[in-house]
């Protein structure tokens, strides 16, 4: 399992204790199957918050997808040149449980202050706990990331598995805004699932990022899954043998 730090293990243990306190493992695994179906077959419902509707789906998201996102981002930022450069602030757009933002921030020395933003109140609370567990200084706020006001000064901006949950009308203006921030010295990292049909806007964004001097990558990494993730993986019949994603970095 990587990263193999005590804090990562403690975070996983706290997630398991919290989310299995009032739900059985069977209930969570059943909710994970439903959540996976939402991502694969009913992605149009994501803009309405379908992924986090109900305790079961929220627990499944936190226990399964959160650790996977953390491991993926931790790997990506180690591979991207300048991703680990010192920066005062990390803006975690659509922070979810904070797993992805914590992975990037924890890899930087010294860790930046995190600003976690999400439209879902449960996600904001969950992210605050995640950042705190990793010993990161952070503020969280319930905000629509499509209309976010970026902080003054240099920052790293992360949008991990978040932009595809916006409508096209809400998403498109962000491209120019993120490119402008990068032109003034910010680091911008966008991550989405690898499946080609998931983000139909991806190729257009990729071309724009590459024209601006950025890069696009696809990732397939094999790691030992954390025990709770592996157990849910088997129980829900998802057969995750590797962690995958694609990224844009500017």
Please provide the spans of the model-predicted regions.
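Class I SAM-dependent methyltransferase Rossmann-like catalytic core
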Residues: 47-76
